[in-house]
Structures are given as structure tokens and as C-alpha cells.
């Protein structure tokens, strides 16, 4: 949004990508996780870091280790009471849109509300996110330069998503790329190639590709030396062939 909004605004909003204010694990959040998974955290995980490794507007992510398998995982947890807050936000948007439209005849943004409603429904259902991630993962099995963390179905619900833990750094962290011997231009080329394939080949597109949702790993077996990691699969769009062929 740097080309649309003032820098002072975008600098403030960028923290919502993965460094938003988090919710303490004790109390309502821990209770919600246990209710969703059907057991105390101590029975499911041998380790569960109470400090989130990332926090955004809808959820926060904790690093943990599954007790039975020893697998290190990332547990994405939806904030408690978020669904009711979203209902209130949508109502406020409807009132504001109607009021502005009443006073300004040229204001024609009523289409935004249904769009936000559809997006909210998708992003508040982590099982839908799981289905999206599994679909996009299957689409890119032929490529070694892109990775989608796999989801542990038995530990995932509408409000809790448990997935393979993947390390890496943000795609806008040029210093980290240079430090690891990666070429930023080659990383950018991979991103363009991956999203171009989503749009023109599969017609199934990740619609929230901000730097908090795209990571880079070093990967010795690729000639480029890197691998793109796609995160947060809550919001996708299917593109009709007629739309894709227009481009």
C-alpha cells in the first residue's frame, strides 16, 4: 500500500502482518484451545511456548511440540470472541456505508460489505484454511522451490490450526537474504513465477500475500539456493477461465 497511503500510515499498519498485540495464553485463550482440541494442553503437547512467535489481526501462532510424535509444530489460535466482534464490525461498516451513500450520491461502495462478509467467513474457519493449504500444496508438488507446511488434521479445528513448524525469514528482509548468500532478484523471480502459476495455470490464488505470509528458506538442492514458503491460506479466490484468459 506504499503507493496509495502515506508512509507514516503504512509503517504503523505493517505491524498487523505478524507483530500485532497478542493475547496472554492463560485464561480464555488456553481454555478455548483445550475446548477445541478436547484435552488439556499438557496431554497433547510436551512443550508449548506461551509467547507467540507471530501475532496478526485474527490469530496468533505458538511454537509447540507434539507429545506423541515429538514433532515441532506451529499452532495458530484464533482470538477468543473474535466472531462476535466481526459481526459488530460488519454492522458498523453497513451503517457507515449507508450513511455516506445517503449524503454523497457519487459514493458507490456498497459492494464492499458483501466482499468483507465473504472474506470474514473464510478467514474465521481454519478448517477451510486447511483445505486451501492442502489444495495449493498438491498443485505445487512438481516444484522444489515452493513449500506449503502440512497440517495435522487431528489437532486442527475451526479455531485452532496445527501445522508443521517451518523456519525462515520474511521476503522483505533483504539483509537476511544477502547474509545467507541469496539473490533478492532471484527470490522475486520465484514469487512472480509461483503466483503467475496460481493465476494462469490453476486459477486458484492466495489473496493475502503480504511479507508476513511469505517466507524464504535456504535450500541447497535447488539451483537458486532458496525455497519460498507460503503461509496463511485463509483467503483464496477461484478465477474463471474467461477471466484468466483475458490476461
Protein language model regions, located:
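Broad phosphate/nucleotide-binding scaffolds in NTP-utilizing and phosphate-metabolizing enzymes
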Residues: 1-196, 216-241, 245
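Glycine-rich phosphate/oxyanion-binding loops and their immediately adjacent helices
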Residues: 199
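Conserved catalytic-loop position in the HRD/HxD motif
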Residues: 203, 208-210
Amino acid at each position: 500500500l506504499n503507493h496509495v497511503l502515506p508512509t507514516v500510515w503504512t509503517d504503523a499498519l505493517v505491524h498487523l502482518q505478524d507483530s500485532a498485540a497478542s493475547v496472554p495464553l492463560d485464561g480464555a485463550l488456553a481454555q478455548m484451545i483445550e475446548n477445541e482440541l478436547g484435552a488439556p494442553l499438557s496431554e497433547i503437547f510436551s512443550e508449548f511456548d506461551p509467547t507467540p512467535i507471530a501475532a496478526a489481526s485474527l490469530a496468533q501462532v505458538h511454537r509447540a511440540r507434539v507429545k506423541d510424535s515429538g514433532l515441532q509444530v506451529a499452532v495458530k489460535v484464533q482470538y477468543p470472541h473474535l466472531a462476535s466482534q466481526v459481526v459488530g464490525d460488519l454492522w458498523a461498516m453497513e451503517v457507515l456505508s449507508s450513511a455516506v451513500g445517503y449524503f454523497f450520491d457519487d459514493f458507490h461502495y456498497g459492494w464492499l460489505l458483501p466482499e468483507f462478509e465473504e472474506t470474514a467467513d473464510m478467514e474465521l474457519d481454519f478448517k477451510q484454511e486447511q483445505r486451501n493449504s492442502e489444495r495449493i500444496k498438491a498443485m505445487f508438488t512438481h516444484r522444489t522451490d515452493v513449500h506449503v507446511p502440512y497440517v495435522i488434521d487431528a489437532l486442527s479445528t475451526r479455531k485452532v490450526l496445527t501445522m508443521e513448524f517451518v523456519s525462515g525469514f520474511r521476503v522483505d528482509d533483504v539483509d537476511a537474504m544477502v547474509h545467507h548468500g541469496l539473490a533478492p532478484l532471484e527470490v522475486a523471480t520465484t514469487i512472480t513465477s509461483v503466483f503467475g502459476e496460481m493465476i494462469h495455470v490453476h486459477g486458484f490464488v492466495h489473496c493475502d500475500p503480504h511479507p508476513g505470509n511469505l517466507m524464504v528458506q535456504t535450500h541447497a538442492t535447488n539451483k537458486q539456493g532458496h525455497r519460498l514458503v507460503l503461509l496463511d491460506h485463509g483467503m483464496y479466490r477461484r478465477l474463471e477461465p474467461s477471466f484468466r484468459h483475458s490476461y
